[in-house]
């Protein structure tokens, strides 16, 4: 009887081993998972789980281990003792690690599934089911990293919530980053309950480095602390929807603060607060903070350590730019600051002298364009370009939108006679703001970074350094769309990509063509019809000077003063004009008409565009353009009429 029992027990153990072998064999046989398998083999608890229980294992690839910076990988943190398919994964699952710290599951709108900060590779999941023990393996692209206690602190809890982490941060393995200043402000404001709250939240904690300004810590009140918490939402950086504002705990009737994440092309992650509705203590505007230590899992959510507090606006525009000197490697505007200083730093002094100022600051990536390198060597030209990014006004998105209500907003810069042209499309999170300056169209990728004396808007191109041809500019600029359409159907535009010629193009803006509709309604209609493309092309040819150089407005004013007028070569003939400067604006005098220059000197890689308020159009052009036949057809009709008259006379 005893022998039979022993035999039965041996058979059961063998069956368990066989069941476990199914998943273990798949792990062992996959060479891309060998590093995790070797760790699994040496862990008795993990082996026991595979032998005896249902489970889900999240298995990092070998490539993920190569990117993993920590010395220790925690196998049990990758295992949960219940089987979950991808579809059945709940918001949290308990890991098998000591203290059972949770793993957070995020399913985003793209269909991706994340475990903490690791993405599940959907096609590689494996399921086995033997003797009722269902086991599932999901392959992930990152090693899961739990919050662990430093050696010598055995009394510190293994699975702390955000408050316990904040109180004992020095005892955890978080790269020796201090948070004492913020911790003391949380205690003084009696806001521990915010970090102690049960549930699943995102906590943002400024590090001590962010409180170098002596008065900054005193500005951290209860509302600011609320603004560092996103309640009821766990956001790991890889799973974050970029520029997707989430209501912070400081979102109420009289104060509304949102928080969102965004990522630079170099992979650096930032978080920003946007105070939409402020009060006497909390200004409206955006505050950026770099994430210095991301994705620290705690029992009630996730903690991100950030380089400065959110919501607090306590630096001038100059001080904000100077802060990138200290953050030489990864600052969002590091390159912009370097270019200013390489130019002698006088631009920074000019900015500092302004009581109200707005900066259009190109991102680090914007300076990587090859055509900028040549300009960087020319200090005078570079000074003009930098000044083109400075506005003597406090200009946020709301103010730009007000200026943009009925037309494209025109705003002067500190560069003499140079304007920027803003265009706002969409509402709310769908708002797109573009700005044109010196022939370059840029998109605002981060608006309303607030400072005590103004705003900084981060843009994706350097203004004043053209990167497109005359045709490319016409095609992309909303103010020139009518001229572009007319040139397209008449094939006039075909020549404008030629980089062997230099063009000076006087382009009527859309409102100019709309005025001709009032002055000559019949002609206006026909100018935009393909059947009359010959006439459209002839009129456009008058607006285009073709030479071996382009002519700026200053050139044309100078030539006009010297000779009384300027004669420019065009495709068929020449264009005779006089250009004058009146009160800082330019006026073209053509055939006794005065035409305002709305946007001078829009530079392109193969020429220059001057946007004018009205086309170079005469009444006699309208008579010619009013015909409904091409010249060849007109000649045929005249000949036919002459023949008919001759025949009639002969018959008589």
UniProtKB/Swiss-Prot annotation:
The keyword Repeat applies. Expressed on different subsets of axon bundles (fascicles) in insect embryos. GO terms for biological process: axon guidance; calcium-independent cell-cell adhesion via plasma membrane cell-adhesion molecules; cell adhesion; extracellular matrix organization; homophilic cell adhesion via plasma membrane adhesion molecules; neuron recognition. Its main location: membrane. SUPFAM superfamilies: FAS1 domain. Residues 626-652 form a propeptide. It comes from Drosophila melanogaster (Fruit fly). InterPro entries: Adhesion/Biosynth-related, FAS1_dom_sf, FAS1_domain. The gene is Fas1. A lipid is attached at residue 625 (GPI-anchor amidated alanine). Residues 1-21 form the signal peptide. GO terms for molecular function: cell adhesion molecule binding. This is Fasciclin-1. It holds the Pfam family Fasciclin.
């Amino acid at each position: 009887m005893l022998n039979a029992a022993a035999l039965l027990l041996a058979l059961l153990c063998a069956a368990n081993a066989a069941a476990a072998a199914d998943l273990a064999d798949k792990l062992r046989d996959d060479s891309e998972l060998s590093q995790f398998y070797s760790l699994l083999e040496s862990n008795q608890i993990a082996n026991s789980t595979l032998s005896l229980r249902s489970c889900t294992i999240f298995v990092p690839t070998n490539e993920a281990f190569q990117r993993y910076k920590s010395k220790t990988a925690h196998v049990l943190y990758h295992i949960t003792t219940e089987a979950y398919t991808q579809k059945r994964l709940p918001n949290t699952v308990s890991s098998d690690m000591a203290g059972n710290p949770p793993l957070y599951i995020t399913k985003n709108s793209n269909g991706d599934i994340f475990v903490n900060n690791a993405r599940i590779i959907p096609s590689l999941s494996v399921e086995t089911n033997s003797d009722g023990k269902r086991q599932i393996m999901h392959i992930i692209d990152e090693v899961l990293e739990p919050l662990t206690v430093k050696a010598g602190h055995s009394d510190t809890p293994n699975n702390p919530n955000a408050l316990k982490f904040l109180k004992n941060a020095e005892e955890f393995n978080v790269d020796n980053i201090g948070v004492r200043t913020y911790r003391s402000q949380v205690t003084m404001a009696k806001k521990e309950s915010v970090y102690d709250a049960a549930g699943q939240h995102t906590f943002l904690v400024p590090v001590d480095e962010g409180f170098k300004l002596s008065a900054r810590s005193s500005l951290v009140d209860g509302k600011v602390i609320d603004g560092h918490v996103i309640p009821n939402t766990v956001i790991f950086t890889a799973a974050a929807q970029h520029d997707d504002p989430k209501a912070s705990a400081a979102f109420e009737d009289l104060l509304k603060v949102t928080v969102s994440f965004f990522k630079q092309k170099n992979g650096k992650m930032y978080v920003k607060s946007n105070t939409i509705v402020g009060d006497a203590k909390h200004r409206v505007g955006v505050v950026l903070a770099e994430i210095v230590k991301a994705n620290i899992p705690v029992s009630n959510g996730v903690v991100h350590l950030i380089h400065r507090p959110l919501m607090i606006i306590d630096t001038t525009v100059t001080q904000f730019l100077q802060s990138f000197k200290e953050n030489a490697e990864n600052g969002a505007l590091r390159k912009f600051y370097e270019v200013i200083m390489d130019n002698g730093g006088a631009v920074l002094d000019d900015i500092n002298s302004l009581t109200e100022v707005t900066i259009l600051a190109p991102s680090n990536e914007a300076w990587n364009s090859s055509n900028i390198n040549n300009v960087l060597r020319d200090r005078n030209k570079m000074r003009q370009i930098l000044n083109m990014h400075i506005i003597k006004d406090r200009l946020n998105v709301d103010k730009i939108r007000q200026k943009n209500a009925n037309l494209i907003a025109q705003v002067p810069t500190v560069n003499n006679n140079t304007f920027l042209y803003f265009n706002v499309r969409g509402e709310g999170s769908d708002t797109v703001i573009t700005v044109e300056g010196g022939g370059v169209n840029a998109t605002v990728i981060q608006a309303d970074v607030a400072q005590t004396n103004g705003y900084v808007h981060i843009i994706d191109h350097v203004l004043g350094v053209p990167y497109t041809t005359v045709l490319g500019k016409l095609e992309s600029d909303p103010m020139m769309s009518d001229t572009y359409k007319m040139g397209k159907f008449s094939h006039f535009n075909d020549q404008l990509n030629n980089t062997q010629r230099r063009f000076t193009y006087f382009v009527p803006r859309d409102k100019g063509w709309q005025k001709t509709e009032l002055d000559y309604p019949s002609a206006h209609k026909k100018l935009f019809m393909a059947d009359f493309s010959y006439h459209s092309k002839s009129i456009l040819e008058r607006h285009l000077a073709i030479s071996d150089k382009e002519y700026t407005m200053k050139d044309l004013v100078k030539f006009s003063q010297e000779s009384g007028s300027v004669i420019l070569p065009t495709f068929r003939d020449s264009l005779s004009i006089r250009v004058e400067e009146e009160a800082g604006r330019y006026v073209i005098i053509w055939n006794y008409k005065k035409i305002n220059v709305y946007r001078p000197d829009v530079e392109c890689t193969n020429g220059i565009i001057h946007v004018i308020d009205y086309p170079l159009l005469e009444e006699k052009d309208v008579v010619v353009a009013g015909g409904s036949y091409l010249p060849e057809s007109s000649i045929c009709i005249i000949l036919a009429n002459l023949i008919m008259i001759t025949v009639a006379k002969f018959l008589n």
